[in-house]
């Protein structure tokens, strides 16, 4: 999946770098796998703002993604590669041999017409999903479960991948994209390969309007706010704001926010890089 750097015909085009849609083969999603999606504007059920800088944007419909891949032993053919407005990666439409249809996150190298399968007996090939107990050591994987049968929770964004480094008893040792090394039950499933659309990280909006299309509002700096709005606000004229803090008053640079007694810490062998 490539990128397009536009010619500077207007100020908004000058620095714009967008993804190329050359690998996308269908413009309309599968109707049975699409549901409506209500925009929240960053508000919760009581109307209170819980997330700043969200609002507006183009109306989006949610594509139902199969993160469980539990149709074991039934081969599926890749019908199309599609754009999904709800995530950075592309999605692939699968037609199963029994007539079922589903969407999966499209891994790098997956082509239309290719056959994928899930289950313990599946070959460790791109797009196939199998328990990590059956995946060879050193394999690049994504869409990793944290609990067997729960569905993929980790390594799902564009270009992301983890590596199965070793196995110890009932656990598989995984090196995560963050650099963290941790144990996960070997009965958990993972999909072979890296997530596609790796050039997503190189994209640039080019203009404020494109950010608004995506539902991103202007992000105001704390140092230019009033003291009532932010710990770094106020002062006479321009001020440095003192020690960088979040809006809640926590130190913004270097403070560890992970709970010291979190139960899952015993599964982490090596903490992530800074």
Swiss-Prot record:
Keywords: Ribonucleoprotein, Ribosomal protein, RNA-binding, rRNA-binding
Disulfide bonds: none
GO terms, molecular function: rRNA binding; structural constituent of ribosome; transferase activity
Source organism superkingdom: Bacteria
Coiled-coil annotated spans: none
Mitochondrion among keywords: no
One GO CC annotation: large ribosomal subunit
Main function: One of the primary rRNA binding proteins. Required for association of the 30S and 50S subunits to form the 70S ribosome, for tRNA binding and peptide bond formation. It has been suggested to have peptidyltransferase activity; this is somewhat controversial. Makes several contacts with the 16S rRNA in the 70S ribosome.
Name of the protein in its database record: Large ribosomal subunit protein uL2
Organism encoding this protein: Parabacteroides distasonis (strain ATCC 8503 / DSM 20701 / CIP 104284 / JCM 5825 / NCTC 11152)
């Amino acid at each position: 999946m490539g990128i397009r750097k536009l010619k500077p015909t207007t100020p908004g085009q000058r620095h714009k770098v967008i993804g190329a849609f050359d690998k996308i083969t269908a413009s309309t999603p599968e109707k049975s796998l699409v549901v409506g999606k209500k925009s929240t504007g960053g508000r919760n059920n009581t109307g209170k703002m819980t997330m700043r800088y969200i609002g507006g944007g183009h109306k989006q419909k949610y594509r139902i993604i199969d993160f469980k891949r539990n149709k074991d032993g039934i081969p599926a053919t890749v019908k199309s590669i599609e754009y999904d407005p709800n995530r950075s990666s592309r999605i692939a439409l699968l037609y199963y041999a029994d007539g079922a249809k589903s969407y999966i996150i499209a891994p790098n190298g997956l082509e239309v017409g290719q056959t994928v399968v899930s289950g313990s007996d599946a070959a460790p090939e791109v797009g196939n999903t199998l328990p990590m107990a059956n995946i060879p050591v050193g394999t690049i994987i994504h869409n990793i479960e944290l609990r067997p049968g729960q569905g993929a929770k980790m390594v799902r964004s564009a270009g992301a991948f983890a590596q199965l480094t070793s196995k110890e008893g009932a656990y598989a040792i995984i090196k995560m994209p963050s650099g963290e090394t941790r144990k996960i039950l070997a009965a958990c499933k993972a999909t072979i390969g890296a997530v596609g659309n790796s050039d997503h990280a190189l994209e640039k909006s080019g203009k404020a309007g494109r950010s608004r299309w995506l539902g991103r509002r202007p992000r105001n700096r704390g140092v230019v706010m009033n003291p009532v709005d932010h710990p770094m606000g106020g002062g006479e004229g321009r001020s440095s704001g003192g020690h960088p803090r979040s809006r809640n008053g926590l130190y913004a640079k270097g403070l560890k926010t992970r709970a010291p007694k979190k139960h899952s810490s015993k599964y982490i062998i090596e903490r992530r890089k800074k």
